[in-house]
């Protein structure tokens, strides 16, 4: 797999041109463009595993991917968009499990989750039930990889089954504006794929909100990626999340980073709106006085579909809106309504996914 590194600047310029054109109707300021590293920028990767027999009858294992156009599989020895740690682990893992029936039989996929801090989680997916024998072999594999210098976690997954030998997460450390922020990242949960671009996004969000007054509300905060970084800029932060594992990670991250003004609530945006408006009462809110919060800034990072109409109406009521988008077209659609009441103070492109058409962007909106 060869990357068109020599074309990176042109590809990024094309993304910036297209995003600028989408934002023109809303009279934005000049677009801030944040470029990625040109290789080894991705912190996670997933590969199917192909089983074959060589010319002398030995079983062989390969990482494979599928061509998006032809659907043909191709062998992956090295993966230049993934960080160096993943590439090193790819070859070491296959070398260590080759010929091991317990670890290779019905193994169909391997997922890698790595960090800038040097930790890596390897999730091995099987079409079979995993037993104590598998667990013993996996523990021996972990020990051999650790002997090679890897800080590794091994997780086995099968239908309705998950075995983590030690733990099912890695701990990332991100240097943000001169401070190291600690984030627990659970395997098979969402994390920002381009860690160094994530740092740029966090620093940009912090710079937008630096002189804020009042409190911040974040919808669907995940493991607290943004809310932890932004907490310093606000009196209090209230964040919602529906995933139980993400809430647990967020609570851990809050404690590890010494944040004392951030409250995570496990509920949906719709439920939170009902609670704020006094429509319903929730046991999950016992001990939390919503009236004590003065949330005049809201942070949203919606899925590709953008904000639904009800959430859009709710967001529009806030004085300041920080909107991170993974789909510029739905961002532009949402801005048709938001621009009636708010102006774009700042706009940015974050090249989270080089060499693809995917665009990550951010707008900082202030009420007119």
Curated annotation (Swiss-Prot):
This is tRNA/tmRNA (uracil-C(5))-methyltransferase. Dual-specificity methyltransferase that catalyzes the formation of 5-methyluridine at position 54 (m5U54) in all tRNAs, and that of position 341 (m5U341) in tmRNA (transfer-mRNA). PROSITE patterns: SAM_MT_RNA_M5U, TRMA_1, TRMA_2. It comes from the Bacteria. One of its GO terms (molecular function) is tRNA (uracil(54)-C5)-methyltransferase activity, S-adenosyl methionine-dependent. Keywords: Methyltransferase, S-adenosyl-L-methionine, Transferase, tRNA processing. Its EC number is 2.1.1.-, 2.1.1.35. The active site is at residues 326, 360. PANTHER family: TRNA/TMRNA (URACIL-C(5))-METHYLTRANSFERASE (PTHR47790), TRNA_TMRNA (URACIL-C(5))-METHYLTRANSFERASE (PTHR47790:SF2). S-adenosyl-L-methionine binds at residues 192, 220, 225, 241, 301. It catalyses: uridine(54) in tRNA + S-adenosyl-L-methionine = 5-methyluridine(54) in tRNA + S-adenosyl-L-homocysteine + H(+); uridine(341) in tmRNA + S-adenosyl-L-methionine = 5-methyluridine(341) in tmRNA + S-adenosyl-L-homocysteine + H(+). The gene is trmA. One of its GO terms (cellular component) is cytosol. One of its GO terms (biological process) is tRNA methylation. Belongs to the class I-like SAM-binding methyltransferase superfamily. RNA M5U methyltransferase family. TrmA subfamily.
């Amino acid at each position: 797999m060869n990357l068109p590194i020599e074309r990176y600047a042109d590809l990024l310029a094309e993304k910036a041109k297209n995003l600028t054109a989408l934002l023109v109707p809303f009279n934005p300021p000049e677009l801030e463009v944040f470029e990625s590293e040109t290789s080894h920028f991705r912190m996670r990767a997933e590969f199917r595993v192909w089983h074959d027999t060589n010319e002398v009858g030995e079983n062989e294992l390969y990482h494979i991917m599928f061509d998006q156009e032809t659907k043909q599989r191709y062998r992956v020895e090295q993966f230049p968009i993934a960080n160096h740690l993943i590439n090193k682990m790819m070859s070491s893992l296959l070398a260590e499990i080759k010929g091991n029936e317990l670890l290779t039989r019905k193994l169909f996929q391997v997922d890698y989750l790595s960090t800038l801090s040097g930790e890596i989680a390897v999730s091995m997916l099987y079409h079979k039930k995993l037993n104590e024998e598998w667990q013993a072999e996996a523990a021996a594999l972990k020990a051999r990889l650790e002997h090679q210098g890897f800080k590794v976690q091994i997780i086995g997954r099968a239908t309705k089954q998950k075995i983590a030998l030690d733990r099912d997460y890695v701990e990332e450390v991100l240097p943000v504006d001169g401070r190291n922020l600690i984030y627990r990242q659970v395997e098979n949960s969402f994390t920002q794929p381009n860690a160094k671009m994530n740092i740029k996004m966090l620093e940009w969000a912090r710079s937008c909100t630096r002189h804020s007054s009042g409190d911040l509300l974040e919808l669907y905060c995940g493991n607290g990626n943004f809310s932890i970084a932004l907490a310093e800029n606000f009196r209090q932060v209230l964040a919602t999340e529906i995933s139980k594992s993400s809430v647990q990670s967020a609570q851990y991250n809050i404690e590890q980073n010494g944040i004392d003004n951030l409250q995570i609530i496990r509920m949906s945006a719709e439920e939170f709106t009902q609670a704020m408006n006094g429509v319903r009462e929730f046991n999950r809110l016992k001990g939390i006085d919503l009236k004590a919060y003065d949330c005049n800034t809201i942070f949203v990072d919606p899925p590709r579909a953008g904000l639904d109409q009800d959430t859009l109406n709710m967001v529009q009521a806030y004085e300041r809106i920080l909107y991170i988008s993974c789909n510029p077209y739905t961002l532009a659609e949402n801005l048709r309504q938001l621009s009636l009441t708010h102006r774009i103070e700042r706009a940015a492109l974050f090249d989270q996914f080089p060499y693809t058409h995917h665009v990550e962007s951010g707008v900082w909106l202030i009420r007119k």
